[in-house]
Amino acid sequence: MKRWPVFPRSLRQLVMLAFLLILLPLLVLAWQAWQSLNALSDQAALVNRTTLIDARRSEAMTNAALEMERSYRQYCVLDDPTLAKVYQSQRKRYSEMLDAHAGVLPDDKLYQALRQDLHNLAQLQCNNSGPDAAAAARLEAFASANTEMVQATRTVVFSRGQQLQREIAERGQYFGWQSLVLFLVSLVMVLLFTRMIIGPVKNIERMINRLGEGRSLGNSVSFSGPSELRSVGQRILWLSERLSWLESQRHQFLRHLSHELKTPLASMREGTELLADQVVGPLTPEQKEVVSILDSSSRNLQKLIEQLLDYNRKQADSAVELENVELAPLVETVVSAHSLPARAKMMHTDVDLKATACLAEPMLLMSVLDNLYSNAVHYGAESGNICLRSSLHGARVYIDVINTGTPIPQEERAMIFEPFFQGSHQRKGAVKGSGLGLSIARDCIRRMQGELYLVDESGQDVCFRIELPSSKNTK
């Protein structure tokens, strides 16, 4: 990630900057909407005010025109100089209102026509108690022009309302498009800052996954992003180095322990064998019993050491490569390897492989099957049955190892996969259990992207199930 001079160095600064930049377009939109709303409000108030003034003026001009005509006719009937003065006052008032109304009229010709009519009506001309013919014509023309003025005023007022509506619609459309653009800008910034924050978190997640899988992080790990996340990455790298060192120390300790234990154990085994062969002299029955106990204990100790070393070796192994494994040969090999103890206990084994293959590592899977089948033989009931079966369930293959015998107590089921745990039901045979077999088996299955667990099967005493990925050749 390229760092700019103003790039936030901490996660808090980055989050604050993200919030500010994402809110900025929304604040701009809100500010512009407020300004536009104020402008439209002022414009609407102005339109309403001018419309009211113009409408009242046009109404007043209409009334003034009627009063002028009434005063004109009254003067012709009464020939009263006072009425002449009233008429001229009304004419002057109409002229002033016409000048004020000139800006409202859409056509200057109408204004000039009214102005000319007012000029023509400046002198009162009467005949036979009424306006003469020319004056009557001028009064008629003035009334007609005044009516046209009122209609023109109404048209102008209506057009103002329509113009205001069009402007409101245009502003609404403008803000609609602007809102869409600003929303897209905000969305782009959300995605950008999400990537800037999630990217380093994903790197840390990958580092933790590699660490959990037992793979080395190496020295090529690059750290980017806020200082807090870079610090976490550095601590994870330090933790990886520390775990690697502890793992190497553990392996070294186990190698030394194995060497230090196997050497005296071999001498002990050799001594007990010499005593058992009576090389140093004949033994009494009591002495033979003691030698037998020593030999059995030394064998158990050797088996325990070998299982402990095997358990740690499998934990330290790198990730396995899965391949297509045919189940039938593995099962046949495992059953054959334990045929003698099974025959000695008169146990019957059924094999039912409906799923013929799975994805696994052959040696690890054989080791697990060998452990489970060996447990079924040695923990199973005399003259009992053992069943090895497989089935396909979606993208997973189930391999069940079932035997008759004493069921595992409910309170022990959660503990049987823990290292060194031995249940209340003891193993039958010359070699006693160490409590590591099932723990090693589960670790092996999990390294092959599978799972090993105990299930309840109707009509069966004990059933261990292996769950593994199915292969393309699985039927």
From Swiss-Prot:
Pfam families: HAMP (PF00672), HATPase_c (PF02518), HisKA (PF00512). The chain crosses the membrane at residues 14-34, 174-194. It catalyses: ATP + protein L-histidine = ADP + protein N-phospho-L-histidine. Keywords: ATP-binding, Cell inner membrane, Cell membrane, Kinase, Membrane, Nucleotide-binding, Phosphoprotein, Transferase, Transmembrane, Transmembrane helix, Two-component regulatory system. Autophosphorylated. Residues 35-173 are periplasmic. Signal peptide: none annotated. Member of the two-component regulatory system GlrR/GlrK that up-regulates transcription of the glmY sRNA when cells enter the stationary growth phase. Activates GlrR by phosphorylation. This is Sensor histidine kinase GlrK. It comes from Escherichia coli (strain K12). The lineage of its organism: Bacteria, Pseudomonadati, Pseudomonadota, Gammaproteobacteria, Enterobacterales. The gene is glrK.
